[in-house]
């Protein structure tokens, strides 16, 4: 897994000393940098504070998919899927070097709980929500085509469906969005620890530590985009916001030594019917993910032995002759609304609580998907507009090209 960094080029270290910003963003994951870009493109002055490195947390430890979320249709999250498919189409257009369309294969066996009729219905709705574009079409493979599917177990194979979604390098995408934000005037302090924020009716006072130096600034609004640290950041804000009832859900991925030729695989875990992906990752492949509640320090999350065993059991079930040599593994944390139900069945809708709906000075991003970062950022800026000065928009993030940072 590529490590994150705050200093890809010398320009990343250039910081204009400014005492006041329209928006201060806390957190340098994909949602934080997305807000920085959206705000800067809307003409606002922005400061982003990141405690360690860009994409150091969840934004470098995801499944690295830009997708509509086919399985969310089972929970009737049609709005979320439609938005995600819209965002997928936008990212394929504005970031072709970062986001690439890939074929996905869904195998069906007698023990598969999602039967062919159900899959056809779901994929049909998926195609409709995607606008019936080329990247939204699906088909059932002929029996002869299944022999070329990277050693997929042929015995009792009843059907294989092919559809399309997209893949990215999440850390690279995060860096590209931040670079775009900087080009439109956003400022980055990294590493910089957020210390406190005093939220008042007329604005905010923010303190942070950069190296050994404590600094402060004022802003019209503060955005808490700290991901798994969202409540930790909230505890440093005055007046103290209500603690957000969330669960941290650990997801582990394995990087395997053997690559894939045909594409990506969407498999149903025989143990619990959860969705598991086997994805090409350079010359290797990536297998994931798990979902287990996590209660420790977010920075200390690490793959568990039982998670490795669980994933390799899935691999063995579908690909009995593939190598199971693990050359790397990583774990990340998703932020989900607290609930008694299994993490797999919970909504992925992003929540944007504010301190004052009439004149918001503080907004938190709770949850969120990699695919929807741009749409979420647009909602954040729209929500905060009534608390911000009038500015002239400079660019539209829906059409602004994104390039890899070299």
Where are these predicted regions, by residue range?
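Beta1/beta-strand and adjacent pyrophosphate-binding region of the FAD-binding site
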Residues: 17-31
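C-terminal catalytic lobe of FAD-dependent flavoproteins
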Residues: 170-172, 180, 238-252, 259-261, ...
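A conserved short coil-to-beta-strand element within the FAD-binding core of flavoproteins
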Residues: 190-204
């Amino acid at each position: 897994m590529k490590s994150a960094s705050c200093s890809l080029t010398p320009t990343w270290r250039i910081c204009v000393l400014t005492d006041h910003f329209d928006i201060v963003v806390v957190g340098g994951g994909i949602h934080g940098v997305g807000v920085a870009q959206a705000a800067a493109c809307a003409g606002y002055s922005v400061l982003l504070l990141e405690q360690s490195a860009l994409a150091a947390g969840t934004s470098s430890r995801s499944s690295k998919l830009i997708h509509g979320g086919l399985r969310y249709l089972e929970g009737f999250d049609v709005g979320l899927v439609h938005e995600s498919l819209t965002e997928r189409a936008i990212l394929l257009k504005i970031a072709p070097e970062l986001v690439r369309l890939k074929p996905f294969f869904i195998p069906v066996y007698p023990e598969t709980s999602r039967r062919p009729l159900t899959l056809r219905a779901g994929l049909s709705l998926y195609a409709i929500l995607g606008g019936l574009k080329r990247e939204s079409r699906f088909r059932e493979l002929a029996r002869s085509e299944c022999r070329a599917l990277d050693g997929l177990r042929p015995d009792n194979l009843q059907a294989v469906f092919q559809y399309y979604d997209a893949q990215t390098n999440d850390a690279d995408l995060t860096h590209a969005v931040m670079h775009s934000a900087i080009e439109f005037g956003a400022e980055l302090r990294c590493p910089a620890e957020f210390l406190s924020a005093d939220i008042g009716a007329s604005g905010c006072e923010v303190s942070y530590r950069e190296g050994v130096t404590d600094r402060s600034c004022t802003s019209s609004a503060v955005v808490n985009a700290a991901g798994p640290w969202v409540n930790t950041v909230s505890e440093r804000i005055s007046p103290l916001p209500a603690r957000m009832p969330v669960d941290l859900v650990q997801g582990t991925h394995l990087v395997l030594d053997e690559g894939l030729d045909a594409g990506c695989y969407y498999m149903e875990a025989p143990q619990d019917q959860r969705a598991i992906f086997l994805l090409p990752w350079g010359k290797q492949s990536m297998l994931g993910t798990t979902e287990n509640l996590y209660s420790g320090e977010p920075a200390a999350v690490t793959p568990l032995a039982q998670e490795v065993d669980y994933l390799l059991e899935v691999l063995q079930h579908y690909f009995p002759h593939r190598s199971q040599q693990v050359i790397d593994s990583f774990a990340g944390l998703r932020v989900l609304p607290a609930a008694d139900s299994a993490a797999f069945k919970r909504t992925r809708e992003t929540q944007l609580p504010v301190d004052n709906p009439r004149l918001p000075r503080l907004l938190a991003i709770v949850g969120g998907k990699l695919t929807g970062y741009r749409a979420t950022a647009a909602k954040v800026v729209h929500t905060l507009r009534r608390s911000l000065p009038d500015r002239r928009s400079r660019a539209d993030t829906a059409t602004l090209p994104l390039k890899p940072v070299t």
